[in-house]
UniProtKB/Swiss-Prot annotation:
Protein species of origin: Sodalis glossinidius (strain morsitans)
One GO cellular component, as annotated: cytosol
Name by which UniProt lists this protein: Ribose-5-phosphate isomerase A
Gene3D superfamilies xrefs: 3.30.70.260, 3.40.50.1360
Subunit structure: Homodimer.
Gene from which this protein is expressed: rpiA
Keyword annotations: Isomerase
Active site: E103
GO biological process, alphabetically ordered: D-ribose metabolic process; pentose-phosphate shunt, non-oxidative branch
Homology family: Belongs to the ribose 5-phosphate isomerase family.
Protein function: Catalyzes the reversible conversion of ribose-5-phosphate to ribulose 5-phosphate.
Keyword Isomerase recorded: yes
GO molecular function list: ribose-5-phosphate isomerase activity
Binding residues for substrate: T28, G29, S30, T31, D81, G82, A83, D84, K94, G95, G96, G97, K121
Length: 218
């Protein structure tokens, strides 16, 4: 199976976690896009969706899935999204698609976080994938210096502006042994909006696609 076929398999496998008559939290990226395709097959049986990015919102609307603003919703039953890396403790690096802040907010609201990923994203130690940090533009140089002090090598993601109007620094050369502590350290740097470490609020269930099928963790 190709990587895209593995992503499609886990996207459709996540459909069994969707309860009819609920509003579903939807993530961003190529794997989440397959879940949106699957969600369209039950669009008349759910109330709608809350999206973590403008791109996912556009896809949801194009498929006729009602879209809600998060401020209109008291709670979400589930949030389904991909990951750039996930470890055995269900901690993740996310933000390759630059939607990390909205993803983290929706994950916090949802009762259950379903991570969908192909097997290449499952790692023992987080950090091979550069860690995205969303930063207020005026603080870019300051935050970069602070990230160097933490042992990282930050690189400005040229030409990318988040849906919130901010920039992304991708931090290389990190072997993340204590993800919870590092998440807190980086989030405490003035000028950081949020870091793409999902450790304090990790996934509850991971659906991992491989040649052998979809493996359920959690």
């Amino acid at each position: 199976m190709t990587q895209d076929e593995l992503k499609k398999a886990v996207g459709w496998a996540a459909l069994k976690y969707v309860r009819l008559g609920t509003i579903v939290g939807v993530g961003t990226g190529s794997t989440a896009a397959h879940f949106i395709d699957a969600l369209a097959s039950v669009r008349h049986q759910i109330d709608g969706a809350v999206s973590s990015s403008e791109a996912s919102s556009a896809k949801l609307q194009s498929l006729g899935i009602p879209l809600f603003d998060l401020n209109e919703v008291d709670s979400l039953d589930i949030y389904v999204d991909g990951a750039d890396e996930i470890n055995g403790s269900m901690q993740m690096i996310k933000g390759g698609g630059a939607a990390l802040t909205r993803e983290k907010i929706i994950a916090a609201v949802a009762r259950k976080f379903i991570c969908i990923a192909d097997s290449s994203k499952l790692v023992d130690v987080l950090g091979t994938f550069p860690l995205p940090v969303e930063v207020i533009p005026m603080a870019r140089a300051w935050v970069a210096r602070e990230l160097v002090r933490l042992g990282g090598a930050p690189v400005y993601r040229q030409g990318v502006v988040t849906d919130n109007g901010n920039i992304i620094l991708d931090v290389h050369n990190l072997a993340i042994m204590d993800a919870v502590a590092l998440e807190e350290q980086i989030n405490n740097i003035p000028g950081v909006v949020t870091v793409g470490l999902f450790a304090r609020r990790g996934a509850d269930v991971a659906l991992i696609g491989s040649e052998q099928g979809v493996k359920i963790i959690g």
